[in-house]
Amino acid sequence: MKKYFLVLISLTLVACGGIPKNSSIQEGSILGSVPEGSIVRVIASTPQNGMTPEEIVSGFLNASASSENDFKIAREYLIPELRDIWKPTDQIQVYEGQGRLNTTESNSVIFTAPLNSVIDGRSRITLSEPDSQLVQEFKLKKVDNEWRINLDFKGLSISRADLNRSFTTFPLWFPDSSLKTLTPDIVVLPRSTTGNATRLMQLLLKGPGENLTGAVKSAFPVGTTLAINSVPVSNGLATVSLNETVLSAEPYLREVLSAQIVKTLSKIPEIRIVRINVGTSSLIVPNTPIRQSTTLWEKFSPDSNREADALAIQNGKIFRMNTEVTSAISDNYFNSGSWFAATANRDENILAAVTEDRTKFVVQNSTTATPRRVLIEGQGFRIPRSDIFDAIWVTGVNQISVVQNNRVVNVSIDGIEKQNVIDVIPSPDGVRALLIVNTAYGTELRIGTIVRDDQSIKIIYVRKLIRDGFSVTQATWQDSETVLYLDNFSEPASIYSVDTFTGFSKSLYSQLGSRNLASVIKRPTYLTLEDGSLLERVSGEWIGRGNLINATYPG
C-alpha cells in the first residue's frame, strides 16, 4: 500500500473585491489580472543539495515561471538526459488555487490543482471548465545522490499568477474572406524583448489557429517563409526578410500581407517602424513607403469606420442619438410602427427593428431606389445586431435569424442547441461572435467563429471567453478587442469589461436595474435601466438622457 505525504504550496492569486461608493454607481477592481504587489512569489532558484522529492518538484514548478535563457533554471531540476531536449512550450497547463503535492513510496510526486487553461504548441490558449483538475505525476531519480525529475510528459505546468507575470498575449492578424478586414488570432508568449518579433513572424507565416479555420485567410503565398530566421529590432525598426515566394503576391495582396506583418509586430512596444525585405532588397508595395509605420494600415482595422450614431427607442418610436442631440428617424414605414429595438448597418442604408411585442423582425434595405423588406416572425426577439458584411442578426426563443442580401440565411452552432442560446452578438470584424448560453453552471459568455457561405452561416469552435461569470444577461463589442457585459448575479448588477486578447475582466461599475449596454470606441456608452430611462457615460460620470431604451450601435 502506498503512503502519501501531503504538502501544500501556495502559488495562487488572491481575488480582489469591489470598492464601494456612496452612489448607486460603484467602481470595481480588476478580476483575473495581477495587480502590482498582490502576490508573494517564490523567486526561481537552482536546486540545493539535500532537497527532498517534494522540494525538488516545488522548486521546479516555481522555476517554470522564469523563461530566462530558455528556462535555464527549471532545466537544472531535470535529469541530465532531459535538460537539453525538454520543450517547455510544447504545452503549458495553467493552474490556479492551492496546489497539492502528494509524495509516494515509489519515488514520485503527484501534483494536483484546479486547471485554469491550456496553451498548445502553437501558443493558443483554451480556458477550462470550472471543475477541471490538473493531475500531474513527477517521477524522480537519484543523480549523484541528489533527486532530479525524470519528466515523462511534454510541456510545463505554471500557476495563473506566474503566467500573468512571465507571459503575455499578442494578436496575430489575418484577413477575413473578403480580404478587407483583419481579425486577431491571440497567442501567448514569454515576456521577452529580443525573441518575440521572430516568434510572432514564424507563427504568422504558419497561418491561423484552429479556432479561425474556415473564417479567415492569409495573404502570404503558400511557401512564404523567413529568409533569415530572425527579425532584428534596432532603434525602433524591425526588419522582416522573406523568401522570394512572396514576390508572386499581386499588388493588393502585398498591401494585405504588409498590414498583417505591421499590425502583428505593432504590439511590441520597441517597434515603431517595419521594413519588409525580400532577401536584402525591399518588397515593393504600391503607394507604400519602404519604412512602414505601425499606424499605417488602419484601413484594414475592423474599427476604422464605426462612426454612426446610436439608435434608441422612445415611446415605441426609433430615434437617432449622440451626445448633442436626439432626433426621430425619417422613414415613413418605421415611423408608422411601434418598436422594441432597432439597429442599422455602418452605412446607415439598412435599418432593422423588432416590434414592441417582440414577435416580428423587419429588415429594410434602402440601397436601391425602392426599399426592400424582409419580415421574420418568432417569439421573444432580443435587440437586433448588424455586422460589417451588412448582415442583420436577431435572436429569439429557439431561434437565431440572419438577413443578408435580402435573404434569410440559415444559422447553426456547433455543439450548442438553439434552445440554450440566449443571444448572439457578431464582432466588428464579422469573424467572431459572442454567445450568451445556458449551461450547467448558469448563463455564460462564450465566443465562437463565424464561417459563411452563400446559403448558410455556421458558428464553430465555441469556447469560453472568461473563466468565471455565470449570470451574464447582455454583452456588446466596444471594439475588436474589448467586450462589455452585464452580470446580474446580485443586485446591483455589475458591468464588466473583458479584454478578449487576455481574458482579463475588470469590474467597471454597478447600477441598480441595468438592462442593456451600448458602447463603441470613441462614442458615448449608453445604459438602459428597467424603469425605461437611459444613462450616458460622459467624462467618468453618468448623465440621464430621459425616457429612451435599448440603444444600439452598428456592428
Task: Identify the function of each model-found stretch.
Residues 1-4:
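Positively charged n-region of N-terminal signal peptides that target proteins for export
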Residues 12-15:
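C-terminal motif of bacterial Sec signal peptides marking the signal peptidase cleavage site
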Residues 6-10:
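Hydrophobic helical h-region of N-terminal Sec-dependent signal peptides
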Residues 17-555:
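Bimodal "functional hotspot" detector
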